From Swiss-Prot:
Keyword DNA-binding carried by entry: yes
Protein name as catalogued: Chromosomal replication initiator protein DnaA
Record's GO cellular component terms: cytoplasm; plasma membrane
Residue span of region Domain II: 74-117
Free-text comment on this protein's domains from its UniProt entry: Domain I is involved in oligomerization and binding regulators, domain II is flexibile and of varying length in different bacteria, domain III forms the AAA+ region, while domain IV binds dsDNA.
InterPro entries according to UniProt: AAA+_ATPase (IPR003593), Chromosome_initiator_DnaA (IPR001957), Chromosome_initiator_DnaA-like (IPR020591), Chromosome_initiator_DnaA_CS (IPR018312), DnaA_C (IPR013159), DnaA_dom (IPR013317), DnaA_N_sf (IPR038454), P-loop_NTPase (IPR027417)
Residues reported in the UniProt entry to bind ATP: 162, 164-166
Region named Domain IV, binds dsDNA: 335-455
Transmembrane segments: none
Keyword DNA-binding: yes
Stretches for region Domain I, interacts with DnaA modulators: 1-74
Length: 455
């Protein structure tokens, strides 16, 4: 009898040896078999999101079938389904059906273009920290890197400033050059495309301009929203897009918003941008911010304890760029003061940050008291272990507010709530943070309580 659970472990071990950590986590970490039919050999597999489902069906199902046959002589029939409790803050737009466009022979690659690349050597998949806010985008980027021109084309990554869009885009470029050193990869800011086009008209070098942009294997365009209201540029980019797409060359774009939200973007460009996949990156949650700081500290050779990393992460909740900037500021302050980096030094270094301007007189017991009164329960219940909803929600909100309105570390907050582990506090914080975006009652309660505690 075929033991699908043992086989799944065997297959995971095979794939772990093949994939790097980022790719393995993207495709296997939250994927699991849920049932197996001994008669039909149908194996139902649960995946986390539509991107993972598409990648498994296109790229991994054949390997799974081959592995099962080699392992036990079983002709496996994998069926993939998306987890019903999948909870992701990113928006994802399902690709429209691909158009049957004629293809032309592949042009010979030109290595000389690679010399002009301005890819940041640090922007690789290995250096990318995955979290709840970027896992869909990371998965899509990995899929594109594995199958350029065929999986999600174009790939459109959107989100706020400093969230990792450029990192993921350039990681695709690095991956292509690793696997195909002679590939022609062009990475540009949208302003570069605009300037190159204008200069080509002035200098009558349109042929060279089109040779540069229409004969590449991978075109990476950052901040595509700057094409807004530029009709001539949009016309030229439309023809560039058409040529590359018809040649099955990969196009990746980033923007601070969806194509439909870019003002005065032509309808035909909006339409073509939606042929592939549009996926959002949202601000990193607390756990991801801590992981980013830890990796950055290791790269800089800094020794920083977990409580201090936790404190720094709690002070910057906007984007990765500002988060890393806060760490640089702490490092510089430690150098000037000739002192080791600890939580007290971090507090002094970051005192002018907005989030540090918290009510230092506010204590966790006061928060517990106000929350308990608001929800008509007791502080003892908030500190207790009851798991009924009437207690769990107020307890999690109290932990969230303790995190938001005081300087207390995660372990300290956990201690104030009956000795709970810091991971429990982190889970509570992230859960309330997410629910505030979808649950009006939770959002109102948190707003009311903040008003009561801050005034």
């Amino acid at each position: 009898m075929f033991n699908f659970e043992k086989f799944w472990q065997h297959f995971n071990d095979e794939m772990r040896a093949r994939f790097n950590e980022v790719a393995y986590n993207a495709w296997f970490k939250n994927t699991k078999p849920i049932s197996y039919n001994q008669k039909t050999h149908e194996l139902k597999i649960q995946v986390q999101n539509p991107v993972a489902k598409g990648y498994w069906e296109k790229n991994l199902s054949s390997q799974l079938i081959q592995s099962a046959y080699g392992y036990a002589g079983v002709e496996l029939l994998p069926v993939f389904q998306i987890s019903e409790d999948s909870d992701t803050p990113e928006r994802i737009v399902t690709p429209e059906p691909q158009h049957n466009l004629q293809t032309t022979p592949t042009r010979a690659p030109q290595r000389e273009f690679a010399k002009d690349l301005k890819l940041n050597e640090k922007y690789t998949f290995d250096n990318f920290v995955q979290g709840e806010g970027n896992k869909l985008a990371a998965g899509a980027a990995l899929a594109v890197a594995d199958s350029p021109g065929s999986f999600y084309n174009p790939l459109f990554i959107f989100g706020g400033v400093g969230l990792g869009k450029t990192h993921l885009m350039q990681a695709i470029g690095h991956q292509m050059l690793v696997e195909r050193p002679n590939a022609k990869v062009v990475y540009i800011q949208s302003e570069t495309f605009v300037n190159d086009f204008i200069n080509s008209i002035k200098n009558k070098t349109q042929d060279k301009f089109r040779e540069k942009y229409r004969t590449c294997d991978l075109l990476l365009v950052d901040d595509i929203q700057f094409f807004a209201k530029k009709e001539g540029i949009q016309e030229e980019f439309f023809h560039t897009f058409e040529t590359l797409y018809n040649d099955q060359k990969q196009i990746v774009m980033t923007s601070d918003r969806l194509p439909t939200e870019i003002p005065d973007l032509s309808e035909r460009l909006v339409s073509r941008f939606t042929w592939g996949l549009q996926v959002e990156i949202t601000p990193p949650d607390l756990e991801t911010r801590i992981a980013i700081l830890r990796r950055k500290a290791e790269a800089e050779g800094l020794t920083i304890d977990d409580d201090t990393l936790d404190y720094i992460a709690s002070q910057v909740d906007t984007n990765i760029r500002e988060l890393e900037g806060a760490l640089v500021k702490v490092q510089a302050y430690a150098t000037i003061e000739k002192a080791d980096i600890d939580i007290n030094l971090a507090r002094e270094a970051l005192v002018d940050l907005k989030l540090v301007q918290k009510n230092r007189g506010l204590q966790i017991p006061k928060i517990q008291e106000v929350v308990a009164n608001y929800f008509q329960t007791s502080t003892a219940e908030l500190k207790g272990k009851k798991r009924v909803r009437q207690i769990v929600i107020p307890r999690q909100i109290a932990m969230y507010l303790s995190r938001e309105l005081t300087d207390a570390s995660l372990p300290k907050i956990g201690q104030e709530f009956g000795g709970k582990d810091h991971t429990t506090v982190m889970h509570a914080y992230d859960k309330i943070d997410k629910q505030m975006k979808t649950d009006a009652d939770i959002k109102t309660a948190v707003f009311d309580l903040k008003q009561m505690l801050e005034h």
